[in-house]
Amino acid sequence: MANSLYQKHIISIAELSRAELELIVKTAGQLKAQPNPELIKHKVVASCFFEPSTRTRLSFETAIQRIGGSVIGFDNGGNTSLAKKGETLADSVRVISSYVDAFVMRHPQEGAARLASEFSNGVPVINAGDGSNQHPSQTLLDLYSIFETQGRLDNLDVAFVGDLKYGRTVHSLAQALAKFDNNRFYFVAPEALAMPDYICEELDEAGVKYQVFSDMESVIPELDILYMTRVQKERFDESEYAHIKSAYILTAAHLSDARSNLKVLHPLPRVDEITTDVDKTPHAYYFEQVENGVYAREALLALVLNESL
């Protein structure tokens, strides 16, 4: 029996079922424990990044090679002949998809991954980020990291801190965790960077409990997961940014009353929002989280390219 992810476009977390998310998390754990360099042997995967990326691109390309695949592609689409000659994205996708078995793509334009899926001639498209819209593989590694540290994906207390308005990682993770039972969310952000209304409306419809806070200190003792994000300086004037930034900097002292199982996650890169003394605490998990990106992406690629896995 074919798994439901076989040959499926991975465009948005919202389009993945709870069962599919659980399958990816389970497979990631299996591949971390027991590597399999034959899973996509003789498969060729395009890694096409139309805007610069470090972690996501290297993580995907590592994952492809560790499970036996080959990689073609580029890491700065603006410098390719495709862009310089004025070729449309649709035509570029048509051409590249004729060479490969799967198509991993990052693009600055929202909706670009969806467009690519319409012109890929049936080749599965994996969205590696389209503007501020979606970044599903980041959410998959977040889910795997949560499961690895907590042993479950339900009945969790999770705080999202920082830029909740523009941060695509927090939108997708909230949507994913809403598919599981009895999760409780704490949204900690300045009013100008609050979680978007559409996410809150989705949570209301799903019956997910959430609370809104302006500071994080009072919620830390209640948490299993503390998901930090960067407050973006460019969205504020200097005086406002200085005030907001200081309210959302996590130090080791903040964790003195934390639950023993609390883990701090961050999509990286961090700037000032987590001080380096947190790195030495048992709560820090953001570098392990980055490593888990390889296993989550191995699992995703293996399931998309193997009918019976």
UniProtKB/Swiss-Prot annotation:
It comes from the Bacteria. One of its GO terms (molecular function) is aspartate carbamoyltransferase activity. SUPFAM superfamilies: Aspartate/ornithine carbamoyltransferase (SSF53671). Keywords: Pyrimidine biosynthesis, Transferase. Its EC number is 2.1.3.2. One of its GO terms (biological process) is 'de novo' UMP biosynthetic process. Carbamoyl phosphate binds at residues 55-56, 106, 135, 138, 268-269. It holds the Pfam family OTCace_N. One of its GO terms (cellular component) is cytoplasm. The keyword Zinc-finger does not apply. Catalyzes the condensation of carbamoyl phosphate and aspartate to form carbamoyl aspartate and inorganic phosphate, the committed step in the de novo pyrimidine nucleotide biosynthesis pathway. Belongs to the aspartate/ornithine carbamoyltransferase superfamily. ATCase family. This is Aspartate carbamoyltransferase catalytic subunit. The lineage of its organism: Bacteria, Pseudomonadati, Pseudomonadota, Gammaproteobacteria, Vibrionales.
